[in-house]
Amino acid sequence: LPPAQRVPRWETLPCTNMDLKRLRAEVLNPARAGQPFSYLAYSCREGAYLPPVSCQPARLVIVEGSYSHHPALADCYDLRVFVTCSKAEQTRRLQAREGARYPAFAQRWIPLEEGYFAKYSIEESADLILDAEKGMIEATKS
């Protein structure tokens, strides 16, 4: 969400920088119904919405992102995969991606993500856990 649309104190409340209702309405509902859809992703780096992305119906739709596992969206998925790696690997990847912005990113976003994972038991509620560093998959439910 653009800053003007975020709730007060969003930096202390996991997932309040996301518009889950819009994600459901614009992406998840049409995808599950086998209909074409398009969406606008907000770029914090750019401070603006990116150009629209159009998607055609498909048998497999992958919704990626930390907050895509929010319990409010659980009924939209047939399979939930939690992708993880070690803290050292996370740091290495984020430093490569964020460059000079890494310290600010680590201070703001990592605690929010970790709080979200803990509050909603994201890893524990996944059907599969993929260790991206080791290339291993673990089924969490029978």
Residue ranges and their predicted role:
Residues 46-97:
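ATP-dependent NMP and nucleoside kinases share a basic, alpha-helical "lid"
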Residues 1-54, 60-61:
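Conserved nucleotide-sensing/catalytic segment adjacent to the nucleotide-binding pocket
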Residues 75, 79, 88, 92, ...:
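NTP-dependent small-molecule kinase module
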Residues 8, 40, 71, 114-115:
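Flexible, active-site-adjacent loop/turn segments at secondary-structure boundaries
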Residues 20-24, 62-75, 134-142:
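Short, surface-exposed, charge-dense and proline/glycine-enriched linear segments
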Residues 106-109:
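Acidic, metal/cofactor-coordinating or nucleic-acid-engaging core segments within structured domains
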